Amino acid sequence: MNTMTLTPGQLSLSQLYDVWRHPVQLRLDASAIDGINASVACVNDIVAEGRTAYGINTGFGLLAQTRIADEDLQNLQRSLVLSHAAGVGDPLDDAMVRLIMVLKINSLARGFSGIRLSVIEALIALVNAGVYPLIPAKGSVGASGDLAPLAHLSLTLLGEGKARWQGEWLPAQTALKKAGLEPVALAAKEGLALLNGTQASTAFALRGLFEAQELFASAVVCGALTTEAVLGSRRPFDARIHAARGQQGQIDVARLFRHLLTDTSAIAESHHHCHKVQDPYSLRCQPQVMGACLTQLRQTKEVLLAEANAVSDNPLVFADAGEVISGGNFHAEPVAMAADNLALAIAEIGALSERRIALMMDKHMSQLPPFLVKNGGVNSGFMIAQVTAAALASENKALAHPHSVDSLPTSANQEDHVSMAPAAGRRLWEMAANTRGIIAVEWLAACQGIDLREGLTSSPLLEQARQTLREQVAHYTQDRFFAPDIECATALLAQGALQRLVPDFM
């Protein structure tokens, strides 16, 4: 069990990855408590003094001008959660719900939200007990925060809706009881604090980033394997070429290729004096294309890490000044744009991989048997596997369309520009699955190509990559049912089988 002491505003990317991958036992760092209590005291003072403050004693959205009587404040917060839990679609899996919950706790514990420590501790208790609220995947436009998803999360705190406990969907009240927990009653501002925020959008995009990192590393390894399979040159990875341009991502990717390929191999020596002058772009320009993708991954990391540690509530409580100020930190435009840029990178990683697969199919370009199989005609080899890769690459081109340029006004035009960040992040998952399928086909094809260079071997690391596959998937001597091999290679990639061969690049 992963144990984590949460210091609000200081989550690292590796901690977020661990939260996504594994159940966690959270403990709130004691340094957060004074700030949390001070913000609650500020809210209580506003109520006691009869001052009007949005979200504390007013309605919401277009109804913000409606003053709410003190005796209705608790009911106001409960009603807010119930009415806003209007999501649709399949439930998010436990890993995604857990990540959203931890992001929410991290934001609330910063001490700008006016929410009691006991409510934050109730959220922590849900995480620690493995009680996962049923959160539908769809229903947020990423401003004013992720209202519907976070309302569904908050329902479980109230004992409403459904939650999953030990793999079983239960009424939330039952799940809480089985876990030894009690529902909470919300005080002034607490419902709004729970619902306002970009935590669902950020979690969606973070998953996309985590998957993109694996895809990037796997594609670099497969690109190096393909370079060997088609007797490509190592010269385009010369450090001097990339230093002359000065693009850091490109420089770093070329270094990764030099690490994987080493100075030479038996395959490289076999064509050292060949007549070829230049390789096709899908080989020669790998550092340039993958370097640009790496730059996007790094920029996305910076944006999402900042957002993961941000306060995206509204209004914000500045206890030291005794003020509650309305702003727009709930607007997830930074997340939407980061997800859009990441989508371009995921699409290009797959597109370049597909072009290398196509290169291996062409006997004139690869100097290998057509479609990587002997006795062609009787055998079709990798012919349709390449078609599958092309289909996946084409789907990704459509999915890469930017979401952040779209907006539909909501809440009777009070919320007249929105980010569409949840959709921007969520489509990354499908794109990642598509790209993983493409890379799986390339891995199969490149290893087949190297096998066909009979008696010749590649570099030690690339031989490891080939051996890892060959332990699960046999060499193709004649046609066989192909889909299980793609499924096997895809599963190995998802487990990080090739990623572990690549030094840290983020």
Swiss-Prot record:
InterPro entries, A to Z: Aromatic_Lyase, Fumarase/histidase_N, HutH, L-Aspartase-like, Phe/His_NH3-lyase_AS
Cross-link (5-imidazolinone (Ala-Gly)) at residue(s): A143-G145
Record GO cellular component, one term: cytoplasm
EC number: 4.3.1.3
Keywords, in A-Z order: Cytoplasm, Histidine metabolism, Lyase
Reactions mediated catalytically: L-histidine = trans-urocanate + NH4(+)
Signal peptide (residue range): none
Gene Ontology BP terms: L-histidine catabolic process to glutamate and formamide; L-histidine catabolic process to glutamate and formate
Entry GO MF terms: histidine ammonia-lyase activity
NCBIfam families associated with the record: hutH, PRK09367.1
Descriptive protein name: Histidine ammonia-lyase
Organism: Salmonella heidelberg (strain SL476)
